Amino acid sequence: MAASAVSYKERQFLAVIGDEDSVTGLLLAGIGHVTDGPDAQRNFLVVDSKTETSAIEKAFQNFTQERKDIAVLLINQHIAERIRHSVDSFADPFPAVLEIPSKDHPYDPEKDSVLKRVRRLFGE
């Protein structure tokens, strides 16, 4: 119990991997944060058609494995599809990974990794 309490107490930020409109909206809502120090890291990644899948994968790994201050990772569902293997295999309780729709790509519950796990749990 104490170990889990320590693991979530430091987690106080949201992170987002998304298209420009989604990230801009969330930044305007106040989730933007840049870490202190010479290696200042942002808690967001703007993805467009020119963004390489490896950059998305690197940001996902950074937000989920390396950074211990992220509590929730929001990722546009169509971007999560590009790194589906990583999203589906991530099973840690923190950060919570939530797939969200974008302006041009509606939400599809059949693709959501969290809903897939819930369905398997209940035998559907």
From Swiss-Prot:
Keywords for this protein: Hydrogen ion transport, Ion transport, Membrane, Transport, Vacuole
Keyword Glycoprotein belongs to the record: no
One Gene Ontology cellular component: fungal-type vacuole membrane
Major site of localization recorded for this protein: membrane
Keyword Cytoplasm found: no
Superkingdom per UniProt: Eukaryota
Subcellular location, record wording: Vacuole membrane
Membrane association type: Peripheral membrane protein
Alphabetized GO MF terms: proton-transporting ATPase activity, rotational mechanism
Subunit comment: V-ATPase is a heteromultimeric enzyme composed of a peripheral catalytic V1 complex (components A to H) attached to an integral membrane V0 proton pore complex (components: a, c, c', c'', d, e, f and VOA1).
Function according to Swiss-Prot or TrEMBL: Subunit of the V1 complex of vacuolar(H+)-ATPase (V-ATPase), a multisubunit enzyme composed of a peripheral complex (V1) that hydrolyzes ATP and a membrane integral complex (V0) that translocates protons. V-ATPase is responsible for acidifying and maintaining the pH of intracellular compartments.
Name this polypeptide is given: V-type proton ATPase subunit F
Gene name of the encoded protein: vma7
